Amino acid sequence: MNNGKVRIYELSKELNLDNKDVLAVCDRLEIPYKSYSSTLSEEQVVQVRQVLAGAAPSEPVAAASAADSPKAERKQEIVSVRRPTPQAAGGAKPEIVGRPTASEKPQAERPNIVAPPRRPAAANEPAKAPIKPARPEKSAEKPEIVTPRPPAPAASAEPAKSPSRPAPAATPRPVAETKKPKPAAAELLRKPEIVRRSEAKPERTSEAPTPRPKIERRPEQTGPARPQLGQPVAGNGVSKPAKPVKPIELVAPPSRPKVAASASGVPAAASRVLPNKPQKPTAPGGPELKQRPKPAAPASGEDLAATVDVFQPVPPLELRRPTAPARPARPRKGWEEEEDERAAANRKAGNKAAAKAKRRQLIQDDDDDDLLTAEQELAAADALNLAMSLARPSKPKVPQAKPAVAVMPTKGRKPRRESARERQHRRRMEREQKPVRPELISLRSSMTVQELAQLMVVPETDIIKSLFFKGIAATVTQSLDVATIEQVAEEFGILVEQETEESGARKTTQMVEDADAESLQTRPPVVTVMGHVDHGKTTLLDAIRKTRVAAGEAGGITQHIGAYHVDVEHNGDQHQIVFLDTPGHEAFTAMRARGARVTDIAILVVAADDGVRPQTLEAISHAKAAEVPLIVAINKCDKEEAQPDRVKQELTEYGLVPEEWGGETVMVPVSAIKGENIDQLLEMILLVTEVEELVANPDRAARGTVIEAHLDKARGPVATLLVQNGTLRVGDVLVAGSVLGKVRAMVDDRGDRVEAATPSFAVEVLGLGDVPAAGDEFEVYSDEKSARAVATSRADEQRQSRLQQAMASRRVSLGTVSAQAQEGELKELNLILKADVQGSVEAILGSLEQLPQKQVQVRVLLAAPGEITETDVDLAAASGAVIVGFNTTLASGAKRAADEAGVDVRDYDIIYKLLEDIQAAMEGLLEPELVEEPLGQVEVRAVFSIGRGAVAGCYVQSGKAIRNCNIRVRRGSNLVYTGTLDSLKRMKEDVKEVNSGYECGIGLDSFSAWQEGDIIETYRMVTKRRTLEV
């Protein structure tokens, strides 16, 4: 101490207390301070010492309580809600009400915290109580009142400290106060808590005093811990405890714990779990537990006297120290020792980590004496510094009891632990076990060596080795074509079957959902017109629409899907029909399949003078795959060579039997040019529509399919959408495939703007972020955020599929493709394809895949709808590609850039010519081959010897003989000589050639063994353009 002042931390060291305990007393005495380094005057030190010694005058306490009263009032408000004390016996209530009205509410809170943990502290206090019997009651009550409160806020943190705190008999009171500083008002509130225990059920206390001591131990410990977390629980018995406890001071201590246990439902439940722990340290632990709850009771103020008297008989706190911490551990250890042998057996069997934890505890228990002594020493040392947390021991005991309960089930679960090991063993065995090799595998397309190895359950190295012996150097990431896979699989004794691809016309999505059932309305039918090229599909549609669309088609053939609306009058009512016109050229298979997938009725147009053709059969298969009704329109019946009956006969062979022949297929002979039987055809369409019962819900967000899409240089991405359910409106946010867009405008088939598109309505939509793929389904979303998330995820999926396709394109076949590539003989034709609409791009790419690519491979660097731009020209110049445009134009500056870069730009409007030119370009990349061209045949009729050689006198039988041409000399069936005609003379003069019917002389430098009758074949080698080999 310097100058009569003492720092708080020095005072706490002197008193063997925590700094926070002294700070709590300062709060109670209203002594100002900033931290534990603050100084106290001599008077303030005296006051603190008096409070901590339990002899402090009641005035500071009263002052503290007065200061705390406002805070207590707040808690009183909270407690009062739960406090309805009328539940307790009416006799006890009046006494409690008379004592502390303000503290009654706190009493409810306090029983929860104080009852179990505070007993040890109280036990220490009674030792000093005998010196001042009157005062200790009140002084002990207040510190203890503080003690119960701190546990409530920090119940979870200090449970372990409980055993050590009971040791200091003189200090426990100040310790309680130290924890109290955080909630000063709480001290007053918790005073009634102790009373609550005693009052909890006075009837029971009087009825059965003997069993209560046991129950007291269990509920007290559990009761304080649990109520601390949930303070409102204590509110039920606040009023009862105050006065009933005082009259029965000596008897109350045992009864109070019991009442606490029974009074509150929570303690009762806790008692069930706690009994195990209290039972283990029965002799020493019992009194200790009783002592702890009793100090909680003094919180009321007057009850302290009773509690002090009771605690005085049990001053030896030393027993408490070992019993609370050490003995609960001993029973566990003793109990676990019985399982030592079992645990050892479990180790061998390979038990789980839980069993290992038990074993560790058992191993620690081997030195019981050493551990006990060490624990006792630690408990004694901690007790000097611990105070209020004595309430916590109950909590540790609760968890301890729970583990004990948990351990018991673990014994029952032992077989489960063993089963886990067995499961691991089984998995190990399964890994070691070789999987069964399949006898049959099914393929849809090419696959990589790695995928094939997994499918065949064969090591990848074995497949690579097999390919190597076939002359193919492959890696695990290279793709094998189906023919190669079949040969490899055959080596391993596995059969291969090819899966049939699903038709593109199959309907995969149900547009009308169950939720739409209550709002369904009839919708117009969607009718798709299909058939072979030049059979009159568009002309028939023109006759129906009374327009002339066909005249505007390039080459007179349709190369897009067109959507048209037609109003038809039937039985006096106006009906609307939506027609989809599909191209008939073989390159547009995907378009026809797409049209069939979204259609309700299919019209098959067959020319009466041409009959069933390849695309007719394809259209039939699309209609069957889409499971839509089919109406046959036999067109061009006005021609003289028309044979409708022959067409019906041909269709019968493919399962389409006309109604007049006893079948179910409607067949109508029509003439598109003359307009004959058009009304009959429309009537049949409406009749079939009535049978189909086509419905949709126009009151929901729109869903449908992208029929066609293209990039317009003025309007941006434009898509033709067919609404199949719901209503599409301007401003809707939609996702088509992986493309996000917001509808800015909609245009119908006649070019008029519309604000809404109802079911079965086809419109051109502006406002998409990119050109969607034709055939993609679109859906309208309520908010842009969710729509963007869907579009992003779909874009990622498409990116992955493109990567897989790129890997698959690096295919390896049994031919000489890989060898040619290594030798530089494999040629590539790089193309950049731009078309007017997405469907045309799709059709051209499909046609290019059909071209033979053994000698020359076509690499499409870019395929997209839209006009040819300077960017395309730059890409073509960098990669040596040819730009191919289909029904598109060049952007400004693109033509000049192409001329400067020397890029070849081709534009086409008919797909026939485009494919022919691309095939010709592929053939042009091939090295020309030398072909033998026969010139003529010459017969040797005489042989003239000249010097060391000989000259043959010949007659040209056919063709001609040309000097320096190639010749073959044949004698009978034998080839005598092959070489060059070195000298050719006629009438002793050198000539260039001799025609048939003339005689000539032929001399060779390296051959002179002529004989009469020899035949000389003259020929020459010419270069000929190579064609693509299939």
Swiss-Prot record:
Transmembrane segments: none annotated. Residues 671-673 are annotated as: G5. Residues 556-560 are annotated as: G2. GTP binds at residues 531-538, 581-585, 635-638. Keywords: Cytoplasm, GTP-binding, Initiation factor, Nucleotide-binding, Protein biosynthesis. It is found in: Cytoplasm. The keyword Nucleotide-binding applies. Residues 56-361, 394-434 are annotated as: Disordered. One of its GO terms (molecular function) is GTP binding. PROSITE patterns: G_TR_2, IF2. Residues 134-144, 188-206 have a biased composition (Basic and acidic residues). GO terms for cellular component: cytosol. Residues 635-638 are annotated as: G4. The keyword Protein biosynthesis applies. It comes from the Bacteria. Residues 56-69, 111-132, 154-164, 259-273 have a biased composition (Low complexity). Coiled coil: none annotated. Residues 522-695 form the tr-type G domain. Residues 581-584 are annotated as: G3. Residues 531-538 are annotated as: G1. Pfam families: EF-G_D2, GTP_EFTU, IF-2, IF2_N. PANTHER family: TR-TYPE G DOMAIN-CONTAINING PROTEIN (PTHR43381:SF5), TRANSLATION INITIATION FACTOR IF-2-RELATED (PTHR43381). One of the essential components for the initiation of protein synthesis. Protects formylmethionyl-tRNA from spontaneous hydrolysis and promotes its binding to the 30S ribosomal subunits. Also involved in the hydrolysis of GTP during the formation of the 70S ribosomal complex. Belongs to the TRAFAC class translation factor GTPase superfamily. Classic translation factor GTPase family. IF-2 subfamily. This is Translation initiation factor IF-2. The lineage of its organism: Bacteria, Bacillati, Cyanobacteriota, Cyanophyceae, Synechococcales. The gene is infB.
